[in-house]
């Protein structure tokens, strides 16, 4: 059970925004979805990519001192042979994604007696060690996320994380007052403000419905609906992280699809599409605009990673189980960004 405190010395007092926030923020949305299988994925929103690829990491690829771990697949920027994951899922079905949390994320120095993990290795260490959400909770019970950089000139990204499998979903936020682990009953995460505030804000929208509204304004007035969709009037439509959280939660909660793989994957991308960004709508600097660089969907039960990019709206898939998961070398698939158009004549 998640307890939300909304007064006194609480999460509101911990929420801050850096002076250069407009320059530092980039926006993302992560969701879960379940039909016959469990699905997990996200939009990554930014103004430019960093050469990210879909990466399969086999069990015997060396992560520092760890020579053996669960195999995993995800989106990463591979630097000096090391996959810096944006999001990933392991062979057991546990998934994780890092989302921007500027102004609130805080990583300190190593603490004796704690499980010290650098921010850049958080996803890899977690998914390499934990088979499910219960093991992830135990893994996080004594964790200290440090500001140790991957290399000189590459500072730690300010993130928080959504972690999930078919049995549950949690959010991890490392702030100045410690590491917080929250249950996530809606299976959605965006960026700022901190997760408890995002979740509490759903109370303002409890009257929204996919059904047509009834006239409760006045029995003396002959008020009638004049359009479909009026039950959701008031649902935020802007691109701010708070509004995307509310919109994604509403769409996910009311989303219906068939149980087949194609129907499930298609619906998953439609849910993410409700909060995707189009070039020109979110200016971050003169002439520079944030867009949804890619959207991804993991079938966590089958080990398949699906994605589409801003320029390529077709769905591309990588199946981790078609690779040698007992190998020692990562397998990298650069994202296909070229627009693909199917002509019927």
Stretch-by-stretch model annotation:
Residues 4-26:
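Short, Lys/Arg-enriched N-terminal segments with co-localized hydrophobic residues
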Residues 25-115, 142, 147, 332-336, ...:
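A contiguous strand-loop segment
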Residues 113-149, 261-270:
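Proteins synthesized as precursors that undergo proteolytic processing into mature forms
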Residues 134-174:
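Active-site periphery "cap/insert" segments of enzyme catalytic domains
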